[in-house]
C-alpha cells in the first residue's frame, strides 16, 4: 500500500480524488492501492526545556543559556492531534511506500519530516512537489516523484530555523522575565514577535510625540484655472 501524507484535509481530498482513493475512513481515504491521510499543520514540536533535564525546570539565571546536546521532538498535546497521529502511525507501519505530500516549501518539509520521524517510518519515502492543486499539476507531480533525500537540505534549513527560534525564545524569555518581569508576568521574546512589537511601539511613540509643522502647497493660476500639486499627498 502507498501512503500519501498531505499537510491539510482539503489537500488530501484533492489528491485522493486523483489517485482513486474514493473510500472515506476516519482520518484517511483509501482505494486503488493508496491510502491518503493528512496532518493539521504542525503535529510535532521541539521538546520543552524541562524535558531535556530536570535542572531546567526552575527559571534561574544560572541555568542560562540552555543549549541541549541534541534536540528532540514531541507530539503536541492535543486530543485531535494525538488521534490523527495515531492513524498516521498505523498506516505507516504497514506501508510499502510513503509519499510526502507536504506543502512545497521549507516549513512544509519540516512538518512532514517530524511526523515521519515520530512515527518511526522505515519504508522508502518519496516527495510530491507541486505548487498547484489542479488535476494536471497533481498528475504531473505523481509522474515525477523524487526520493525524499533530494530535499534533505530543505529539511535541515527548516530544522535550523526551528532550533534558532527555540534557543532565542526559551533563553531570552527567561532572561528578560527574570530581570524585568518583577515576579508578576512572563516577558515573551521571539524572533518575529519582538521586532514586530518594536515596530508597533516605535510607531505609537511617533504618534504621541508628533508636533505639527507648517507646510506649503504649490498652486498656480493659468487662464483662470488653478493647478495644484497632489503627488505625495
Give the label of every model feature segment.
Residues 6, 161, 165-232:
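Prokaryote-biased recognition of long, low-complexity C-terminal linker/tail segments
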Residues 1-166, 170, 176, 232:
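Intrinsically disordered, low-complexity regulatory segments
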